[in-house]
Amino acid sequence: MDVRSLPSNGVATIQDSAPTAATILGSSAATLGRHLSRRLVQAGVTDIFTVPGDFNLSLLDQLIANPELNNIGCCNELNAGYAADGYARSRGVGACVVTFTVGGLSVLNAIAGAYSENLPVICIVGGPNSNDFGTNRILHHTIGLPDFSQELRCFQTVTCYQAVVNHLEDAHEQIDKAIATALRESKPVYISISCNLAAIPHPTFASYPVPFDLTPRLSNKDCLEAAVEATLEFLNKAVKPVMVGGPKLRVAKARDAFVELADASGYPVAVMPSAKGFVPENHPHFIGTYWGAVSTLFCSEIVESADAYIFAGPIFNDYSSVGYSLLLKKEKAIIVHPDSVVVANGPTFGCVRMSEFFRELAKRVKPNKTAYENYHRIFVPEGKPLKCKPREPLRINAMFQHIQKMLSNETAVIAETGDSWFNCQKLKLPKGCGYEFQMQYGSIGWSVGATLGYAQATPEKRVLSFIGDGSFQVTAQDVSTMIRNGQKTIIFLINNGGYTIEVEIHDGPYNVIKNWNYTGLVDAIHNGEGKCWTTKVRYEEELVEAINTATLEKKDSLCFIEVIVHKDDTSKELLEWGSRVSAANGRPPNPQ
C-alpha cells in the first residue's frame, strides 16, 4: 500500500498498490520506535517537529534512525504543534514529538487549533517508564500526583483518538489505529509511548508492509439520489442561484467536484474567508470572498440577493458571520456538509458524501447564468492604483499592491490572525498559489510555526508570511528553525505598535505593546549561521527595493522585511468587522 501520494494542500489519500510479499525485518529495525517511524513515512510524513525531553530521548533516537524521516528541532512545543499544523495543510498529515506533560500541555493549544481546522496532526508524547504506572510514585514533569492521566484527559477533547502505549504486545495495534483514525477522521490524535519501550524489538514489528485500516466512506445510493432530486427541484425553481465554498471542502476532499458543479451550472462562485484558495480564483465565474459586510466588492450584493445559495462545507461562527450579521435566509439555502445535505431548512439527507453529491448534481443541473450576468452588470473595475509620494509614510493598501505582483504558482501566502486576514483576502491568487490562515481558532502567533511547517512540506514554493508585531512577539523564536533548515520564506512583519485587531474590537492600554528592534532580533537569531537577510522599510520606494532584493539577489535566503506603518493604518474591512464583532461580544444578558 502506497500512502505517500498526497494532494498539495489537501488531506492524505490512500492508494492501494499491487500486493507485495511481507518483508521480515531484523531485530534492530523491529523496535517500537522504528515501527512508528515507518508508519509515519507510509502515511506521508517525512519531517517531524520535535522538542527533546528526558521522556522522549530514546524514542527520538529510534525515529531519526530512519533515513526517510527528517528531524526538525523546534524552539518550543507550541511552535512544534503549529508547524505540524502548517505541514498537514500542505502534505495532508503532520506530526510532532514532545515530552510528557510539560511538553504535552504546551503543545495542547496548537493541537486544539488543528482540531478546529480538521487537520490530521499526530501528536506523539514520550511518556513515563511503563513500570511506574499504578505504583503511586510521584514523577517529575507532572503536577505532583501519582495519577499520570491528567495529560491524557486534556487531550481527549482536542483529539479524535488517544493511544497510551505501556505494553509492547498491543503497541502495533494502538499505533496503527491512531494513525488510521487521524487520516480517516481528518482530526489530530494523541500517542503516548513509555520511555523504556521505544528501543525494544517485538515480533509484531517485524513484518511490513501492513495495510492501514482505512475503510472508505461511500454515499448511500438511495439517500444520494433523494438529495440530488430535492436539490434539483429547488434549484430549477430559482431565478438567480449562487454557490459559496466553505472551509470543509478540504476535509470532504470535494474541491474538484465543487468546481465541476460550478462549470456545469454557470452559477457565480464565491468562497467564505476560511476557504480562500480552495477554488481557483481564475475561474470565469469567480466573484470573490463572501464575508457579509466586509466581502469583496459586489460579492455580498450578489450572494445575499440570490433566491438560492449552495453553501459547501460552511462554518458560520461569530467571526465568519461578522458578528452574526449575515443577510441570509435558511429557507433559501442548500447546506452541503461532508456527509449530509440540508435543503431549504427542510429535509436532511444523511449518508451523502459531498464530492459524490456535487458530481451527480453537475451531471443533471440546468445551467443558469442570471446571477453572474447581474454581477457582471454591477461590477466596476478597481480605480487608479494607490501610490505614495516620495518619502511619504508607507500605507498598507499601497504595500499590498506590490505583494500582489509577487504571487505566482510558485508562491504560497500565510496570513496571521489580525489585519493580515483582511488585507490578504483581497489578494487575487494565481492558479496554484497556496493560501492558509487559521480563522476558526484564531490563535495569535500561529503563523510563525505554521510558516515553518508549510515551507518544510512544500520546498518548491516560496512562502510569503504576513505577521503583525503583536502576534510575532508570541512565537518569534522559531524563525531560528527556519534559518537552520535553509528555508527561503519572505516574512513581512507589520509593525504598527500593538494588537490592531483587538483595538478595533475593544480598545484599551493593554493593546499597546513594547516595540522591539525586530530586524535586530532576527539578526541576533541568525548569528551568521545560514542564509538570512533583514531590512526595515518606511516608504514605498524602500519596499519596492526590499522586494526586488528578496526576490532576486536573496532568493535563496530567508528574508525578513519589517514594514513600519502608522498604528491607525488599518483596512476598512477590519474597521467594519471589528465594530460588528464588538457589538456581538457586548450583547447584554438575556432576561431570566
Swiss-Prot record:
Source organism superkingdom: Eukaryota
Residues reported to bind Mg(2+): D469, N496, G498
Induction details: By wounding and paraquat. Not induced by anoxia.
Enzyme class: lyase
EC number: 4.1.1.1
Cofactor(s) of this protein: a metal cation; thiamine diphosphate
InterPro entries recorded: DHS-like_NAD/FAD-binding_dom, PDC/IPDC-like, THDP-binding, Thiamin_PyroP_enz_cen_dom, Thiamin_PyroP_enz_TPP-bd_dom, TPP-bd_CS, TPP_enzyme_TPP-bd, TPP_PDC_IPDC
Record's signal peptide: none
A Pfam family: TPP_enzyme_C
Keyword terms: Decarboxylase, Lyase, Magnesium, Metal-binding, Pyruvate, Stress response, Thiamine pyrophosphate
Region ranges (Thiamine pyrophosphate binding): 419-501
Cell membrane keyword on record: no
Gene Ontology terms, MF aspect: magnesium ion binding; pyruvate decarboxylase activity; thiamine pyrophosphate binding
Annotated binding of substrate, by residue: D54, H141, E502
Cofactor notes: Binds 1 metal ion per subunit.
Keyword Metal-binding in record: yes
SUPFAM superfamilies: DHS-like NAD/FAD-binding domain, Thiamin diphosphate-binding fold (THDP-binding)
Family stated for the protein in its record: Belongs to the TPP enzyme family.
Subunit structure: Homotetramer.
Listed name of the protein: Pyruvate decarboxylase 3
Species the sequence originates in: Arabidopsis thaliana (Mouse-ear cress)
